[in-house]
Amino acid sequence: MTIPDIASYFEIEPVEPGQLETPVPVIDLDIVERNIRRWQERCDALGLANRPHIKTHKLVGLARFQLAIGARGITVQKLGEAEAMADGGITDLLMTFNVVGAPKLRRFAALARRTGISVVADNPAVVEGLASAGREAGRKISVLVECDTGAKRNGVASPEAAAEPAG
């Protein structure tokens, strides 16, 4: 299968640099494509399922390209990012931040109806909310237990603590 070059995933209109209003992000698509391909080739060579995080680029076009060249799915941090990717037709999503609160759980349930989203959690209350959202969506939600690997930001701190949200 031949994968189109990265530019085919975007609608790009040439602009003279002097016409750009600053500040403006500018990327070299050739370099981006080379880096994404290099990383995917490395993952493939090691037998790793690549699930790139879109928190830096947040572009559906780049995510689609990453999937086209072999990424298993896309990782998102926030519900809005997941919704944007789903609106762009991407359905294999992993959300790496707890979903808490009734409004967000309703949005998560709506998203779960149209995607294969999975999510991480680090405590039983979050898992209970996700189970409720799954029932509302009419499907089981895959939940991974987040473990703190030393950054002391999120996640459970021990194997014993991991068993608690896993129920």
Residue ranges and their predicted role:
Residues M1-S8:
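N-terminal hydrophobic targeting/anchoring segments and the immediately downstream early-domain regions
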Residues H53-G167:
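Active-site-proximal beta-alpha core segment in soluble small-molecule metabolic enzymes
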Residues P23, E33, Q40-R42, K104:
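Expand to "…catalyze enediolate/carbanion chemistry for C-C bond making/breaking, isomerization
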Residues I27-D30, S118:
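Short, surface-exposed alpha-helical recognition segments that flank or form part
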Residues S8-I27:
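Generic N-terminal amphipathic, Lys/Arg-enriched alpha-helix
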Residues D30-R38, E164:
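A non-catalytic, amphipathic alpha-helix used as a structural packing/dimerization or gating element
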